[in-house]
């Protein structure tokens, strides 16, 4: 497996495919929405294996023109942060450490920026695997945000 690399517009079809495999936890997006997210991202990294792109992460800084209510929740409460909008790993590559490698790069980037990392995890519908993943990577719960039928747990990872 190679090191993390910068994502490009050529990666969008595979990113959408991987994202679809993570539903409902990742949230559905079109090819255009994924391209828009890529353009807004402070950090957009992918990891390849022998089959090509195996996982990716997209992160945003505060004050970005992005319509996510979850992102807005952090914007209203924190001045500085690196927001993980989505991290997704292909079905065939899960449990192989790709998510952890991507998060190591996210955490290192946040350290360089001297800011915490933020993310949300679906509470309704539940995503227990993501809860465990974020706990393993040093994230703490800082709130719950509910919108209609959905609810998410808000997480932050500060430098220890």
Mark where each language-model region is:
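Conserved acyl-donor/pantetheine-binding loop and adjacent beta-alpha core of acyl/acetyltransferases
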Residues: 58-86
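Active-site rim helix/loop that mediates acceptor-substrate recognition in acyltransferases
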Residues: 24-50, 64
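A short, internal acetyl-CoA/4′-phosphopantetheine-binding micro-motif in the GNAT/acyltransferase core
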Residues: 85-94, 123-124
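A short beta-loop-alpha structural element at the N-terminal edge
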Residues: 2-15
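C-terminal "cap" of GNAT-fold acetyltransferases
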Residues: 144-160
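Conserved GNAT acetyl-CoA-binding A-motif
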Residues: 110-123
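Conserved acetyl-CoA-binding loop-helix of GNAT-fold acetyltransferases
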Residues: 89, 95-108, 136
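Conserved active-site alpha-helix within GNAT-family acetyltransferase domains
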Residues: 124-143
């Amino acid at each position: 497996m190679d090191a993390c690399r910068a994502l490009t517009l050529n990666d969008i079809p595979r990113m959408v495919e991987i994202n679809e495999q993570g539903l409902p936890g990742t949230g559905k997006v079109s090819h255009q929405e994924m391209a828009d997210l890529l353009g807004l991202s402070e950090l957009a990294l992918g990891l390849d294996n022998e089959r090509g792109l195996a996982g990716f992460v997209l992160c945003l800084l505060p004050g970005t023109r992005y319509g996510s209510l979850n992102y807005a929740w952090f914007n209203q409460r924190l001045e500085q942060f690196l927001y993980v909008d989505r991290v997704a790993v292909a079905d065939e590559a899960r449990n192989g450490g790709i998510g952890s490698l991507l998060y190591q790069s996210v955490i290192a980037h946040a350290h360089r920026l001297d800011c915490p990392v933020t993310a949300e995890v679906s509470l309704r519908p539940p995503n227990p695997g993501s809860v465990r993943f974020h706990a393993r990577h040093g994230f703490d719960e800082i709130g719950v945000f509910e919108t209609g039928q959905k609810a998410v747990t808000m997480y932050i990872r500060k430098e220890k």
